[in-house]
Amino acid sequence: MSDRLTLLRPDDWHIHLRDGAALANTVGDAARTFGRAIVMPNLVPPVRNAAEADAYRQRILAARPAASRFEPLMVLYLTDRTSTEEIRTAKASGFVHAAKLYPAGATTNSDSGVTRIDNIFEALEAMAEVGMPLLVHGEVTRAEVDVFDREKQFIDEHLRRVVERFPTLKVVFEHITTGDAAQFVREAPANVGATITAHHLLYNRNHMLVGGIRPHFYCLPILKRNTHQEALLDAAVSGNPKFFLGTDSAPHARHAKEAACGCAGCYSAYAAIELYAEAFEQRNALDKLEGFASLHGPDFYGLPRNTDRITLVREEWQAPASLPFGDFDVVPLRAGETLRWKLLEAGA
């Protein structure tokens, strides 16, 4: 068993960097490992057009560490009123790489999202024409649907219909959490892919709920039972190019997580590739990590693969109990615990 693992530099195809003072922390954590990242647009107000995407992009670039070449790939936030002209302008910009479907009320800052899928069909047609991928938070939001069933329900009610109606539209089913989603993606045409988070590979709902409620495991879509966790691991290590890395690293200040009504999201960017390495090692599949982390994503998006490399070493280290997050602090995934892999920093 090797104690070193060298990969083409990976990318993160789903990250939340937040905004304002927090960028000084989140951008550096992402840039430490990733060459590029698909940056989620659910700010307040959301990133709805190319001009807003460019302004956000400039704020991210200004927060990059010195000499960093980290590239933010911007995303539009779809609303019921997103026009075909906005889609075409965004595509022509060269820096907007996708548009995101948030069902209204599904997750953090999704209140401006889509109320009926049919309301964005003209926008989706334009996206298919210009070659802009659709990113999907795949959960229904009706109050009567159990929170653990919302992903499967979304597939049956909406996603199958979208994929069938727009056969040339690239669709990324983001942060999948169920065996149902993995099976859907495997059986779908080649234009449908999926991201998988490290926390959904490493944990299930027992980790969040048994022995006390652990708010730093709370995310949306919520952690599912262990059989779904195993199905996600099967997909991730399969070598199937439809599945690729997307951390869904989503920081919230400690007081917003450790609360009577805590926010959803896990902060993993600070040690993302190390966490994925642990998950792949559980399956004796470290040889499949480079494909999942560094190859499948750019290939799906039609972007060049990175050419530089990173190296992980088998070395135990203790994750910090907290990290700075603007004017507050954030408790990262695995806070205070031992990690088994460590990114070898440049010059080390």
Swiss-Prot record:
Zn(2+) 2 binds at residues 100, 137, 175. The keyword Metal-binding applies. Its EC number is 3.5.2.3. Substrate binds at residues 16-18, 42, 137, 220, 252, 264. SUPFAM superfamilies: Metallo-dependent hydrolases. PROSITE patterns: DIHYDROOROTASE_1 (PS00482), DIHYDROOROTASE_2 (PS00483). The active site is at residue 248. Keywords: Hydrolase, Metal-binding, Pyrimidine biosynthesis, Zinc. GO terms for molecular function: dihydroorotase activity; zinc ion binding. It is an enzyme of class 3 (hydrolase). The modification N6-carboxylysine is found at residue 100. GO terms for cellular component: cytoplasm; cytosol. Pfam families: Amidohydro_1. It catalyses: (S)-dihydroorotate + H2O = N-carbamoyl-L-aspartate + H(+). Pathway: Pyrimidine metabolism; UMP biosynthesis via de novo pathway; (S)-dihydroorotate from bicarbonate: step 3/3. Zn(2+) 1 binds at residues 14, 16, 100, 248. Its cofactor is Zn(2+). Binds 2 Zn(2+) ions per subunit. InterPro entries: Amidohydro-rel (IPR006680), DHOdimr (IPR004721), Dihydroorotase_CS (IPR002195), Metal_Hydrolase (IPR032466). GO terms for biological process: 'de novo' pyrimidine nucleobase biosynthetic process; 'de novo' UMP biosynthetic process; pyrimidine nucleotide biosynthetic process. Homodimer. Catalyzes the reversible cyclization of carbamoyl aspartate to dihydroorotate. Belongs to the metallo-dependent hydrolases superfamily. DHOase family. Class II DHOase subfamily. This is Dihydroorotase.
